């Protein structure tokens, strides 16, 4: 895999501080939440994969926010359906 430099990823995000926040958030999604990577993973750790995704333009703060909203909406919808089913049974 090609090496990822912070400078390449900073250009996509704007500054180092926001880069750290976005990369950490995406790395958590990959490592803990089991999200699918937009680049080949190989033997790279989630932080490196997150930086590569940012560098290639697949991940930004706004895409993470939009994905989070979609996930939250799906979770809310499932909870509403569960409550509706319980109420119908009564």
Curated annotation (Swiss-Prot):
Entry keyword Ubl conjugation: no
Any one biological process term the GO annotation gives: DNA-templated transcription
Keyword Transcription: yes
GO cellular component: DNA-directed RNA polymerase complex
Keywords noted in UniProt: DNA-directed RNA polymerase, Nucleotidyltransferase, Transcription, Transferase
Function in brief: Promotes RNA polymerase assembly. Latches the N- and C-terminal regions of the beta' subunit thereby facilitating its interaction with the beta and alpha subunits.
Protein name: DNA-directed RNA polymerase subunit omega
Annotated organism of origin: Pseudoalteromonas atlantica (strain T6c / ATCC BAA-1087)
Upper classification of the organism: Bacteria, Pseudomonadati, Pseudomonadota, Gammaproteobacteria, Alteromonadales
